[in-house]
């Protein structure tokens, strides 16, 4: 039964690409409604697969917007190209190597990025997109439920970690709904969840060297059981560190995102040479 579902339109899901095709119409409708495409939008879909989200999104665009689809499986890219649509532009290649900023410049528009992401590239892709966030309106992604929980986690929770801090420092994150394995063919071994991620306005973000911020967060979470007095010992040589009022008797997972940002600002303003990320 699973194999039959996986051979939709003559294509067999390929494990090396982490392919699980969305087949539940109610879930598809819920995702498209959450995205709420507007006629003038420039959408980018990562991993369109057989087009479960692609075609409903194109219908909502109504011919006025554009949908760029990035597909690594060349057979699927060719399949979508053959079906043809005036507003659909196919890019056969790896989303991890795709230049989203260049596309935004070419379109003279900020991008709305969507996708049912292969689980094996979700974290690397999210970090790749951090460098492109000035060109992005929002992102709607289907992710492994555990990864979604880590991204949206609150301080002090079991899931709160480096991924939470790095992404929440740059985005407003909203976990929309969960999706069961039966919504896919073949069904994955885990549940999924849909997230909305909207970049914070640049004026609301501190002026930081974000590579140094990444190094700070990585150091903080390098040993979760140790308190920050030990994991961030190199940073405590910063002038006026104690005057900042930062409680380094806590563990990394107890510190809110805002405090990491304030700490990074203080370190940067005092010209401390942070370790390279």
Curated annotation (Swiss-Prot):
One of its GO terms (molecular function) is 16S rRNA (adenine(1518)-N(6)/adenine(1519)-N(6))-dimethyltransferase activity. Its EC number is 2.1.1.182. It holds the Pfam family RrnaAD. S-adenosyl-L-methionine binds at residues 20, 22, 47, 71, 94, 116. InterPro entries: KsgA/Erm (IPR001737), rRNA_Ade_diMease-like_C (IPR023165), rRNA_Ade_Mease_Trfase_CS (IPR020596), rRNA_Ade_methylase_Trfase_N (IPR020598), rRNA_adenine_dimethylase (IPR011530), SAM-dependent_MTases_sf (IPR029063). Gene3D superfamilies: Ribosomal RNA adenine dimethylase-like, domain 2, Vaccinia Virus protein VP39. Keywords: Cytoplasm, Methyltransferase, RNA-binding, rRNA processing, S-adenosyl-L-methionine, Transferase. It is found in: Cytoplasm. Its main location: cytoplasm. One of its GO terms (cellular component) is cytosol. It catalyses: adenosine(1518)/adenosine(1519) in 16S rRNA + 4 S-adenosyl-L-methionine = N(6)-dimethyladenosine(1518)/N(6)-dimethyladenosine(1519) in 16S rRNA + 4 S-adenosyl-L-homocysteine + 4 H(+). Belongs to the class I-like SAM-binding methyltransferase superfamily. rRNA adenine N(6)-methyltransferase family. RsmA subfamily. NCBIfam families: ksgA (TIGR00755). Specifically dimethylates two adjacent adenosines (A1518 and A1519) in the loop of a conserved hairpin near the 3'-end of 16S rRNA in the 30S particle. May play a critical role in biogenesis of 30S subunits. This is Ribosomal RNA small subunit methyltransferase A. It comes from Burkholderia sp. The lineage of its organism: Bacteria, Pseudomonadati, Pseudomonadota, Betaproteobacteria, Burkholderiales. The gene is rsmA.
């Amino acid at each position: 039964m699973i194999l039959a579902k996986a051979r939709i339109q003559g294509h067999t899901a390929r494990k090396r690409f982490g392919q699980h095709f969305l087949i539940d119409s109610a879930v598809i409708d819920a995702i498209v409604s959450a995205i709420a495409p507007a006629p003038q939008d420039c959408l980018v879909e990562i991993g369109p697969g057989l087009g479960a989200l692609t075609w409903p999104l194109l219908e909502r665009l109504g011919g006025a917007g554009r949908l760029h689809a990035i597909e690594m499986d060349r057979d699927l890219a060719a399949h979508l190209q053959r079906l043809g649509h005036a507003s659909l532009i196919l890019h056969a290649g790896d989303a991890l190597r795709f230049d989203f900023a260049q596309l935004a410049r070419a379109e003279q528009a900020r991008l709305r990025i969507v996708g049912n992401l292969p689980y094996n590239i979700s974290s690397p892709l999210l970090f790749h997109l951090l460098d492109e966030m000035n060109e992005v309106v929002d992102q709607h992604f289907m992710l492994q439920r555990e990864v979604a929980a880590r991204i949206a986690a609150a301080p002090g929770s079991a899931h709160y970690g480096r991924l939470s801090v790095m992404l929440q420092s740059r985005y407003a994150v909203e976990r929309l709904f969960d999706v069961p394995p039966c919504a896919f063919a073949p069904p994955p071994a885990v549940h999924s969840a849909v997230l909305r991620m909207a970049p914070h306005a640049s004026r609301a973000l501190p002026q930081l060297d974000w590579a140094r911020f990444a190094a700070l967060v990585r150091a903080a979470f390098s040993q979760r059981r140790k308190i920050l007095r030990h994991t961030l010992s190199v940073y405590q040589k910063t002038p006026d560190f104690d005057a900042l009022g930062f409680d380094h008797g806590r563990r990394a997972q107890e510190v809110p995102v805002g405090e990491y940002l304030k700490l990074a600002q203080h370190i940067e303003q005092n010209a401390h040479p942070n370790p390279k990320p």
